[in-house]
């Protein structure tokens, strides 16, 4: 996990030194340049002259996020304990937090000399969201399934996450193609942006910057295709209407439409077709698809937060977050509901008939006869028990003759003693 961060810091330092050398700037700006490049790489924000820029190029950030997630997945793919996960999470979140705090301190120290500022803390929280996303992706579905089994969570929740990612990846691919098509259609606006620069270095820089901002435009296109409006300061762009203002001189912005033709509303079927394709190709239960719709909406919210933000005097640039989240959920959930209903109609539940067990009815006379037979059997059993008890007593008497003789002798002795006493009493009376 330390390797991607170390490589990123090294590249940031090299890029900062190279940029200062090529622009003939003073090395006094080195610390502030390093800090701003680090925040830009982590999709945080940069500030200066009282303005905040958080609409940053997402391509370098997404590559960095992929590198961190790949390193995490390599560390946990074989075997990992809960303690190891705790240490891993602490490193994944603790290292960028420490580096971001150092970058903020460097900007604060340089603000007394240079025209730079520390970005608002709310913008810096995107750095933590960035690395949380890397941790979530790096753990992978296999580890999440193991954790679900360990803590009693339903395992189909992981299937819902996978289903949501399928939809977002397919939707993003289609949106990227639409951006390239729109750029090709508006090629005149693309080339007109570069005609104001004479030197080739500036043209190359604009093209490179457009490529770095390409994921941002792709996410904006996803929002437009789902029906959400895109705000660019006072401008509003959607498939229903377009209200434009002068945009920054960036060639990739030629992909944004300058007007909304009447047929543009038909583009709203694209996400529905994609959701249908995903649900049919990977059939899931209704509960799984509904959960996948919720996860898709939340993941798209994260993407929209990374792609948009504040852009100097334009203020907010980005999608309507509430509308985007709601529409993504509605599209996926509605398609999942329809497919589940159609599948239920095509494959109804078969109810197997249970054979009834015949019940034999007995007549009252037979019941009375059975009861009388039971009573007679009980009486016979009691008589047999009494006879057995009598026989046991007789056997005991026969087995102990000595005891009986002793008892008879003792009785005779008692009678003899009684007669002797009576004789003595009579003689005493005669003497008197």
Report residues per predicted region.
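Extended, compositionally biased non-globular segments
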Residues: 251-290
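Alpha-helical transmembrane segments of multi-pass integral membrane proteins
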Residues: 87, 91-149, 184, 188, ...
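Acidic/Ser-Thr/Pro-Gly-rich, low-complexity N-terminal segments
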Residues: 349-432
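Membrane-embedded hairpin module used as a gating/binding unit in multi-pass transport
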Residues: 170-179, 183-190, 207-224
């Amino acid at each position: 996990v330390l390797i991607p961060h170390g490589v990123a810091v090294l590249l940031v330092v090299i890029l900062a030194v190279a940029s200062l050398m090529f622009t003939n700037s003073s090395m006094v700006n080195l610390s502030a340049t390093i800090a701003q490049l680090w925040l830009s790489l982590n999709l945080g924000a940069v500030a200066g002259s009282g303005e905040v820029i958080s609409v940053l190029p997402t391509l370098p950030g997404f590559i960095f996020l992929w590198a961190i997630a790949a390193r995490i997945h390599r560390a946990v793919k074989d075997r990992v304990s809960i303690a190891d996960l705790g240490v891993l999470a602490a490193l994944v979140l603790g290292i960028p937090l420490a580096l971001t705090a150092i970058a903020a301190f460097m900007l604060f120290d340089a603000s007394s000399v240079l025209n730079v500022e520390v970005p608002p803390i709310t913008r810096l929280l995107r750095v933590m969201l960035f690395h949380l996303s890397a941790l979530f992706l790096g753990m992978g579905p296999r580890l999440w399934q193991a954790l679900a089994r360990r803590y009693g969570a339903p395992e189909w929740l992981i299937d819902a996450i996978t289903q949501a990612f399928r939809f977002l990846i397919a939707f993003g691919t289609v949106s990227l193609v639409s951006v390239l098509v729109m750029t090709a259609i508006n090629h005149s606006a693309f080339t007109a942006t570069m005609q104001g620069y004479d030197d080739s270095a500036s043209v190359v820089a604009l093209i490179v910057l457009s490529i770095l901002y390409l994921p941002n435009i792709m996410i904006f296109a996803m929002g437009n295709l789902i029906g959400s409006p895109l705000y660019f300061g006072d401008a509003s762009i959607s498939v229903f209407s377009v209200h434009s203002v002068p945009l920054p001189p960036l060639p990739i912005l030629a992909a944004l439409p300058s007007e909304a033709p009447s047929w543009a509303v038909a583009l709203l079927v694209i996400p529905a077709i994609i959701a249908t394709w995903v649900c049919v190709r990977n059939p899931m239960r209704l509960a799984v698809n509904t959960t996948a719709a919720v996860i898709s909406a939340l993941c798209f919210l994260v993407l929209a937060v990374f792609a948009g933000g504040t852009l100097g005097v334009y203020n907010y640039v980005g999608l309507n977050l509430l509308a985007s989240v709601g529409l993504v959920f509605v599209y996926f959930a509605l398609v999942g509901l329809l497919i589940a209903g159609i599948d239920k109609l095509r494959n109804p539940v078969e109810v197997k008939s249970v054979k009834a067990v015949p019940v034999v009815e007995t007549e009252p006379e037979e019941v009375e006869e059975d009861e009388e037979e039971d009573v007679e059997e009980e009486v016979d059993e009691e008589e047999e028990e009494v006879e057995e008890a009598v026989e046991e007593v007789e056997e005991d008497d026969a087995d102990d003759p000595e005891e009986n003789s002793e008892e008879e002798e003792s009785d005779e002795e008692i009678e003899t003693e009684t007669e002797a006493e009576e004789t003595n009493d009579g003689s005493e009376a005669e003497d008197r």
